Amino acid sequence: MDKSKQPFRKSKRSFRRRLPPIGSGDRIDYRNMSLIGRFISEQGKILSRRVNRLTLKQQRLITIAIKQARILSPLPFLNNEKQFERTESLPRITGTRTIKK
């Protein structure tokens, strides 16, 4: 078969296997805030399994640990820093009413 008539073939690229985000020595626990913090978005949402590159079992354990940490309050439910920022407010207008006699 000529090279010109061969079907399209993708070139084989060597890929480097990514290291797993959870090491063998890491304990998945609600008190391990440094580990849990890696799997939460900036808004405080739990990241998906595809984003985290976790196995199904690891994702389940991480989700349970995050929910326990939220309930026991080392971790907030929402992560809104804007809520605490002070904005300049307009001056209040009081006493503009006049009494007619």
UniProtKB/Swiss-Prot annotation:
Record flagged with keyword Plastid: yes
Keywords annotated in UniProt: Chloroplast, Plastid, Ribonucleoprotein, Ribosomal protein, RNA-binding, rRNA-binding
Residue segments, region Disordered: 1-24
SUPFAM superfamilies: Ribosomal protein S18
PROSITE patterns xref list: RIBOSOMAL_S18
One Pfam family, short name: Ribosomal_S18
Main location: plastid
GO BP terms: translation
Quaternary structure annotation from Swiss-Prot or TrEMBL: Part of the 30S ribosomal subunit.
Name this polypeptide is given: Small ribosomal subunit protein bS18c
UniProt source species: Amborella trichopoda
Lineage of origin: Eukaryota, Viridiplantae, Streptophyta, Embryophyta, Tracheophyta
